[in-house]
Amino acid sequence: MIKKARKKRSDRNHLVYKLQVGKLVYIGVTHVDRGSPAKSLRRRWLKHVQRAMTEDRQWKLCVAIRKHGADAFNVEIVKIVRGKTAAHEIERELIRTVKPKLNTDDR
């Protein structure tokens, strides 16, 4: 019997988060793992930091992490939402209204 890969749920929880250093802001979204939302945000933040320190990315967020250091950033959950589509809609709306300087696009 061949096992089929299990389809990922499309309605799991996601969180919209804000990273800030001084007046520079980044808005992002990630899924909530089986653990707590705080752990999921920490995992995502550490991925941003790892990418900034080990890859030669010139994305605005990576440059800011290298310039100011990871400890200078305030990392916070903005909203927890059920469903990927809803989370991305909120992220896009926040990007339009907040106009964060560290996001690489302005969806």
Feature map (PLM): residue ranges:
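Conserved short loop/helix modules at catalytic or binding sites
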Residues: 31-84
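A positively charged, amphipathic N-terminal helix/segment that binds anionic biomolecules
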Residues: 4, 16-19, 26, 45-47, ...
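Boundary/linker segments flanking structured domains
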Residues: 1-11, 70-107
